[in-house]
Amino acid sequence: MKIKEIIVVEGKDDTVAIKRAVDADTIETNGSAIGDHVIEQVKLALQKRGVIIFTDPDYPGERIRKIISDKVPGCKHAFLPKEEALAKRKKGVGIEHASNESIRRALENIHEEMEAYTSEISWSDLVDAGLVGGEMAKSRRERMGKLLKIGYTNAKQLHKRLQMFQVSKESFAEAYKQVIQEERK
């Protein structure tokens, strides 16, 4: 599988994992202290070939994704479910621990940022679905993020991603229905 866009990852081990799974070029941020030279590389890559941000499904990875998204709007995003990024001995989370199949699947389901889009899904829809507050909220958001392939987030970030990736009310309702069915099992 050849990827046209340049993939932004956190480090060398992620690059090795990406290249093991697909034919692609990467830019490494080397941690969350992203220098101006990395931002310039990402801007140039976006102009020339497009960019996919593919960071670890953990707090530092999400922080890096947000920094790059804010400074270089228009990037695409790939998300890896946390359970597919766990190290063998459960010590650590990262793309470098994912299988080739998981990496390919994440890159087949990329999302594009859309600016100035008003979501069909309101904050009260999230509250009504039990995705904000309450004992089941976190697990429901985890499941929704996985089903919609937008990654796990807190409630505020979930609302933002639903808008950014223009998730339709139908897709949201379908995923929610599936979450509720799974809870009843």
From Swiss-Prot:
InterPro entries: RNase_M5 (IPR004466), RNase_M5_C (IPR025156), TOPRIM_dom (IPR006171), TOPRIM_RNase_M5-like (IPR034141). Its cofactor is Mg(2+). Its EC number is 3.1.26.8. Residues 4-87 form the Toprim domain. SUPFAM superfamilies: Toprim domain. It is found in: Cytoplasm. GO terms for molecular function: metal ion binding; ribonuclease M5 activity; rRNA binding. Pfam families: DUF4093, Toprim. Mg(2+) 2 binds at D56, D58. Mg(2+) 1 binds at E10, D56. Keywords: Cytoplasm, Endonuclease, Hydrolase, Magnesium, Metal-binding, Nuclease, Ribosome biogenesis, RNA-binding, rRNA processing, rRNA-binding. It catalyses: Endonucleolytic cleavage of RNA, removing 21 and 42 nucleotides, respectively, from the 5'- and 3'-termini of a 5S-rRNA precursor. Disulfide bonds: none annotated. Binds two Mg(2+) per subunit. It is an enzyme of class 3 (hydrolase). GO terms for biological process: rRNA processing. Belongs to the ribonuclease M5 family. This is Ribonuclease M5. It comes from Bacillus anthracis.
